[in-house]
Each structure stands twice: as structure tokens, then as C-alpha cells.
Amino acid sequence: MSKEEFMKIQTCVLKVNIHCDGCKQKVKKILQKIEGVFTTKIDSEQGKVTVSGSVDPSVLIKKLAKSGKHAEIWGAPKGNNNPNQSQMANQFKGMQIDHGKAGGGGGGNNNNNKKGQKNGGGGGGGGGGGNSNAPKMGQQLNPQHLQQLQQLQKMKGFQDLKLPPQLKGSVPVNKNQNQKGVKFDVPEDDDDDDFSDEFDDEFTDDDDDEFDDEFDDLPLPSNKMKPNMTMMPNAQQMMMNAQKNANLAGGPAKNGGKGAPAAGGGGAGGGKGAGGGAKGGPGNQNQGGGKNGGGGHPQDGKNGGGGGGPNAGKKGNGGGGPMAGGVSGGFRPMGGGGPQNMSMPMGGQMGMGGPMGNMPAVQGLPATGPGGAPQGYFQGAGIDPMQMQQQQQQQQYLAAVMNQQRAMGNERFQPMMYARPPPAVNYMPPNPHQYPNPHPYPYPYPYPYPPPYGNDQYSHAFSDENTSSCDIM
């Protein structure tokens, strides 16, 4: 081997995707077929392939890529005459990079203008590039070139490279070039600040100020009540109208029976002016005043009464209430005399007459269940006839029943944490024909109770282990 051939020998380290032994053998065969490859060493665990020879690493990468194996240059290759180094040097020969200064005098070597012009040094404030080899916008150093440049700095033969003086041993130039390579024409920080300030000023702050000024900071007027969150919006509006009408009772109406938004149909003698109608009384703001006209309220007028109160009685002939001519479910009849200051108590559950379609409740008393028994915490739970038949077999619950009875009678018990809810026991005369009851029907519970034992039903009734038998525990 001659000296020239020996000097051309170089060692190249490639990173190849090797998954198994088959991949290893395939890569080895491909590399051995290439001319100029002397030795090949493959580390399958790291995917590291070391090739020594006089072949260009780019040729190796192309051959492997054609066979479906992706290869990259790994680390710093050995040897001074590395074609990769000369390739990188050729890439940087045409680039003369300054420190990012946009020349004001249009120097001939200022090639890093932001638009990458190729016109010869024409002077002026723009600093046009005068070198014909100046890179365009897309030919500036990309991150891959920068990474290769950093690898060149770590190589052994970096001193022998024929690089421009700006690149030779000057790390700050490379850092500056890295900044120039990824920087956009428009400053990013200013855009981000302006963008965020724009949204903060136009949308966030203005919206908050607008809602704060119009809605949040305004106190409620004296004639308005705070909305009850458990009521329907219509009920709130009717209650607010009732309060306003009660405060305005006895005085002349401002707009008569037709002016208010919540006004009803108005009676035949509903007042239109300040003095009321021909037959009507003084007339309220939201009611139609006259003798035959029920006002614009759920509880309609009782033959007029001069429109004296918020709700003038029961026998209105017209009006826009939900149940015209009668008491709506759950609402108390409101008298016509005097300002009752929003006196509309809700009877039962939310003025709906009981939650399970029962009769409306009397004010002050709980709503009744379907069977006539007063309701407890479980609304609508009445007496179960099957539970009456089974009361003789629930003797082990008798002591708990004595302690859990309430003043209103047959109610279900409060739910315990671990105990099953026992059935409601009614103190009625036992049916002699049903004793003993052999369970003719299934239990009306989602999980049935265990049947009582024949002889030993009291030994485990209040046991510590049987937590489902005693509610006191």
C-alpha cells in the first residue's frame, strides 16, 4: 500500500437503525460491497457502525438509505483528511459572516441583510450585499449546519480546516449566528407583548369593567326583592310585581292598567289615566283596577274593590294569572286591604302542591302524602298495605321503632350510614288471619330483608355483629 493510499484511509462512525441480528448482517453486507471499505465494525446495541476506508461517508449513507436503512454521522471521525470536513469547509467558504451588524454604508461583504439581496454594493442605508456568493434567506445556517459546525470544533483536525477567520476558533460568532439563524424579521417579544396587551385591554379588562359598572356595583332598589334561587323566574316576577303594587296601593296609577309589562288583560273599567277608569278605583301600576277587571297578577281581583291591594280577592273575571279566577296551587289567597309588603308564603314544596302530585298543603303544615299520612324526609311516602301485613314479623325492630317515631305519625326513618331502612310500622290491630305470615308477596324494597328465624330471633337482634338489625347503633 502506497503512502498516498495510506493517507486516504479514514475512519467514519455512522449511526444506523439496527433492530436485530438480521439488520446487523444486512448492514454489514451492504458496507462490504462498497468499494474503498476496508473494515467494518458494528455495535448493534447502540446502533454504532465504524467503517474504515477511503470512501466518502456520504456514499455510505446513500447506499444504506437505498437499502432502507437510515444512517447518520456519529460523533467526531478520526483522521485529518476527512471529506466531511472538506465538505463543511466548502459550505462555509462562500459565507463571510459578520457579527450581525446591518451596515449603513452598504459594504461589499455585509451579506446578512434580512432580505438576502444579491445586488452588488450599492451603498445606502440598507447595506446591500456585494458578494455574489451571499446566501439567500433560505440558505442561512439551519440548526443542522450549526450542529455539524459544533462537531467540527470538537474534531481533532479542526486547526487544519481552511475556514474563514470569522469561524476559526470563535465560539461567540457561532452563538451569534445561531441567533441570526432562528430569528424572524419581526421582533417576537414586541409582538407577544402587544398581542397580550391587546387582548387584555380590549377584551378582558373592558368586559370586566362593563359588567362591574352595569350589573355588579348597582344596589337593588327598595321596591325590588333579591331573587330567590329556588323559584322559577315567573314566580319571582310575580312576587316583585306584588310588592310594587302593595307599595303603590291607594294612589293614582301612573300608566293605568295597560302600561306595566306584567299587566293582565285589564277589566272593563280598567283605568287608563292618572285618575283611573270610569268605574274603577285609583288603579295600580300593574293592575287593571275596575270592578269587573282582575288585575295583572296570579291572584285575580274580587269584583274590583277599587284596585286597592296587590291581589283583590278570588273571583276575578279576567286577568293574566296562571290560574285565573282561583287560587293557584300552593299560593295563599292575598287580601285586598293594605300594603301587605310581599306577603306570599310558599305552602308545601315550592308552591307546587306537594312533590308527587298530592293535594296542596295548608300554610304552616307539611304537605300530606298519598295515603293521608304526613310526609317526613321522604316526600310522598305513605302507608304500604304490604307492610301492614308484615308487621308481626318485624318484632326485632320494635325497640328501634319506639325511639324513632315522630310527632306526625307514620313516617320513614332517617337514613343511617350502615343500616337498611326499616319499613314503617303502623300501630293497628293485627290481622289474626295473617299470623304467621308465610311471605306471600315479595318485599317492596330493592333488597329484601332476611326472613326471621323460627326460634332464635332475639339472640342476634341487638348483636354487635348484626349491624342491620338495630338503628340505635
UniProtKB/Swiss-Prot annotation:
Residue ranges of the propeptide: 471-473
Presence of the UniProt keyword Ubl conjugation in the record: no
InterPro entries: HMA_dom (IPR006121), HMA_dom_sf (IPR036163)
Residues holding a metal cation: 20, 23
Residue span(s) of domain HMA: 9-72
Region (Disordered): 96-139, 162-230, 246-343
GO molecular function, one term: metal ion binding
Superkingdom of this protein's organism: Eukaryota
Purpose of the protein: Heavy-metal-binding protein.
Family: Belongs to the HIPP family.
Protein name per UniProt: Heavy metal-associated isoprenylated plant protein 32
Gene (name only): HIPP32
